């Protein structure tokens, strides 16, 4: 991937997909899917102390307007079809962050009959945030890692 270069007259010379990836990484609109106590930390990260808005991340109530879904809490088998339907309503490209031990692998309720044992069985997860519950700083770190992942050049496999 070619890095954008700024010329003397203020023109940015780059490929269109590179520019779109750069803009997309700095303008993530997220959908919160809080299922348990991790949602409290997610709300704290959006409050004034940490302020996810300064990273270009704006909460959205509709999946059709969101680029990212943050799954926080225990995902049950009964809730799995609902989250999959919400994910399918999101426009491409779409990203998933799994926040907390329960969303990552079931957490304390891993052996319960009603737990999906991780949202990666339902959705393709891009970033995992460990902890029970993870702190607001950990969520911000995960969001920044997702931004960095989008800015990275794609791997090209050639034979």
Swiss-Prot record:
Known cofactor(s): [4Fe-4S] cluster
Keyword field: 4Fe-4S, Cell inner membrane, Cell membrane, Iron, Iron-sulfur, Membrane, Metal-binding, NAD, Quinone, Translocase, Transport, Ubiquinone
Record: residues binding [4Fe-4S] cluster: 37-38, 102, 132
Reactions mediated catalytically: a quinone + NADH + 5 H(+)(in) = a quinol + NAD(+) + 4 H(+)(out)
Pfam families registered for this protein in UniProt: Oxidored_q6 (PF01058)
Gene Ontology MF, one: quinone binding
Top-level division of the source organism's lineage: Bacteria
The EC number(s) this enzyme carries: 7.1.1.-
GO CC term, one of those recorded: plasma membrane
Cofactor-binding details, from the entry: Binds 1 [4Fe-4S] cluster.
GO BP field: aerobic respiration; electron transport coupled proton transport; mitochondrial respiratory chain complex I assembly
Annotated compartments: Cell inner membrane
Location (main, coarse): membrane
Assembly behavior: NDH-1 is composed of 14 different subunits. Subunits NuoB, C, D, E, F, and G constitute the peripheral sector of the complex.
Family listed: Belongs to the complex I 20 kDa subunit family.
NCBIfam families, A to Z: nuoB_fam, PRK06411.1
The protein's role, per its UniProt record: NDH-1 shuttles electrons from NADH, via FMN and iron-sulfur (Fe-S) centers, to quinones in the respiratory chain. Couples the redox reaction to proton translocation (for every two electrons transferred, four hydrogen ions are translocated across the cytoplasmic membrane), and thus conserves the redox energy in a proton gradient.
Protein name, entry field: NADH-quinone oxidoreductase subunit B 2
Gene behind the chain: nuoB2
């Amino acid at each position: 991937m070619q890095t954008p270069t700024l010329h003397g007259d203020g023109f940015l010379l780059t490929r269109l997909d590179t520019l779109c990836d750069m803009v997309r990484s700095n303008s993530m609109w997220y959908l919160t899917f809080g299922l348990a106590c991790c949602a409290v930390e997610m709300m704290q990260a959006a409050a004034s102390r940490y302020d996810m808005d300064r990273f270009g991340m704006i909460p959205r109530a509709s999946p059709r307007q969101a680029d990212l879904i943050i799954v926080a809490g225990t995902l049950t088998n009964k809730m799995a079809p609902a989250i999959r339907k919400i994910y399918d309503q999101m426009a491409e490209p779409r990203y998933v962050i799994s926040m907390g031990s329960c969303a990552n692998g079931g957490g304390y309720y891993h052996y319960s009959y009603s737990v999906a044992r991780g949202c990666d069985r339902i959705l393709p997860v891009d970033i995992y945030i460990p902890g029970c519950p993870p702190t607001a700083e950990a969520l911000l770190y995960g969001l920044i890692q997702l931004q960095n992942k989008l800015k990275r050049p794609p791997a090209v496999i050639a034979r």
